[in-house]
């Protein structure tokens, strides 16, 4: 069922509550990466350019004590948003009470207000984690502040919080619209369609350290994908399951039997490394060598080897849909980043393919290579992307009204 989108709703003269994902890295009041703020701009601009009042809610980090509040205020984010919008943005240093209500009542059409970090509600109250545990009264209170709710935070779509599910539930109960923003719409369109209705050949590239993080994804995609490429630390659990010696490589021994089952179920769909770059220690400057699928006892695999790079490139040839999540090696160490970077290049060079990238290291690789403009979509969600690829219904999407 298609979801209601912000562009389906009349926002003129309306107070529009928008759950954005402004969970950006901040150190000493300085924002390290403003990508998530930039990603929210199309929805915010649409609302204010069409005569609506934009009231923005977001979490930032995890609040465990009063001490955390100092470093996790959204004040620097509101300032940066004002610079990006090239207009004044009002920051309210609370998210409940008279100060909030007065600020909203004083808004004119086209104004933007940013409320304080929603997770400040996770301490100092009788309920406990009011935001993270979805206190219905908090959701109802926030819903009472607006006429329309827009969820544009894919990064928290796999969580049922007061600021997404709570507000949407209360809005719909009051007969008010709960819509998806343009960013959420994009994730549904590309990531959702890649899983539900991919154009074939459909190839998934999975990497990262742990098989356990990707078990649900592999299980869900075996019937759907034409090939599943496995790289990164998780590959060694599969190589061990095949009977190879993996030396000191990262392995999840409790997942070896499960890896055997997946190998049996997937047949030749699973594409594993055929050679590896190995070293005696986990260190960028460690002396390394290219070895086959068997790794010497005193060494550990830290990247895919040159033959594997060629194999993975060949597997990608002719693909029409590709989803990539996770690095092929220890990407943060330059000497073991080649596999990840080469796979990224191959992805960018695919003609007529829908290419979707998710996960921090894969996204960082795409940016480092300058290939982001050549990719169809870079997902803004970490855990949310994985759960979507697992075929799970995400609460933050389910709570949005259907068209």
Curated annotation (Swiss-Prot):
InterPro entries: Phosphoglycerate_kinase (IPR001576), Phosphoglycerate_kinase_CS (IPR015911), Phosphoglycerate_kinase_N (IPR015824), Phosphoglycerate_kinase_sf (IPR036043). Gene3D superfamilies: Phosphoglycerate kinase, N-terminal domain. GO terms for biological process: gluconeogenesis; glycolytic process. Its main location: cytoplasm. CDD domains: Phosphoglycerate_kinase. One of its GO terms (cellular component) is cytosol. It catalyses: (2R)-3-phosphoglycerate + ATP = (2R)-3-phospho-glyceroyl phosphate + ADP. The keyword Coiled coil does not apply. It is found in: Cytoplasm. Substrate binds at residues 21-23, 36, 59-62, 119, 159. Pathway: Carbohydrate degradation; glycolysis; pyruvate from D-glyceraldehyde 3-phosphate: step 2/5. The keyword Kinase applies. It holds the Pfam family PGK. PROSITE patterns: PGLYCERATE_KINASE (PS00111). Keywords: ATP-binding, Cytoplasm, Glycolysis, Kinase, Nucleotide-binding, Transferase. Monomer. This is Phosphoglycerate kinase. It comes from Lactobacillus delbrueckii subsp. bulgaricus (strain ATCC 11842 / DSM 20081 / BCRC 10696 / JCM 1002 / NBRC 13953 / NCIMB 11778 / NCTC 12712 / WDCM 00102 / Lb 14). The gene is pgk.
């Amino acid at each position: 069922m298609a979801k209601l989108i912000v562009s389906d709703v009349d926002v003129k003269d309306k107070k529009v509550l928008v759950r954005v994902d402004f969970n950006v890295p901040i150190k000493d009041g300085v924002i390290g990466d403003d990508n998530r703020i930039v990603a929210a701009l199309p929805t915010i601009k649409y609302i204010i350019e069409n005569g609506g009042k934009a009231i923005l809610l977001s979490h930032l980090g995890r609040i465990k004590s009063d001490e955390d509040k100092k470093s996790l205020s959204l004040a620097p984010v509101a300032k940066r948003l004002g610079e990006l919008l090239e207009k004044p943005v009002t920051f309210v240093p609370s998210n409940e009470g008279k100060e909030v209500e007065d600020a909203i009542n004083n808004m004119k059409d086209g104004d933007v207000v940013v409320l304080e970090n929603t997770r400040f509600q996770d301490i100092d109250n009788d309920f406990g984690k009011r935001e993270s545990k979805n206190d219905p009264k908090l959701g109802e209170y926030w819903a009472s502040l607006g006429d329309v709710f827009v969820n544009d935070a894919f990064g928290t779509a796999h969580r049922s919080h007061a600021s997404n599910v709570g507000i949407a539930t209360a809005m719909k109960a009051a007969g008010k619209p709960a819509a998806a923003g343009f960013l959420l719409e994009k994730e549904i369109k590309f990531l959702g369609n890649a899983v539900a209705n991919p154009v074939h050949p459909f190839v998934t590239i999975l990497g990262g350290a742990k098989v356990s993080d990707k078990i649900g994804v592999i299980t869900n995609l075996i019937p759907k994908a034409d090939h599943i490429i496995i790289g990164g630390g998780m590959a060694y659990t599969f190589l061990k399951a095949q009977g190879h010696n993996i030396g000191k490589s990262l392995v999840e021994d409790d997942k070896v039997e499960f890896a055997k089952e997946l190998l049996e179920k997937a047949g030749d769909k699973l594409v594993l490394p055929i050679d590896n770059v190995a070293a005696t220690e986990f260190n960028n400057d460690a002396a390394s060598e290219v070895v086959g699928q068997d790794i010497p006892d005193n060494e550990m695999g830290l990247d895919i080897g040159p033959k594997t790079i060629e194999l993975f490139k060949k597997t990608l040839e002719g693909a029409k849909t590709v989803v990539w999540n996770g690095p092929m090696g220890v990407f943060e160490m330059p000497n073991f980043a080649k596999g990840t970077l080469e796979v990224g290049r191959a992805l960018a060079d695919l003609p007529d393919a829908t290419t979707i990238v998710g996960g921090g290291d894969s996204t960082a690789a795409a940016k480092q290579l300058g290939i982001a403009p050549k990719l169809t979509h870079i997902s803004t969600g970490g855990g949310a992307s994985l759960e979507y690829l697992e075929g799970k219904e995400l609460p933050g999407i389910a709570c949005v009204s259907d068209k």
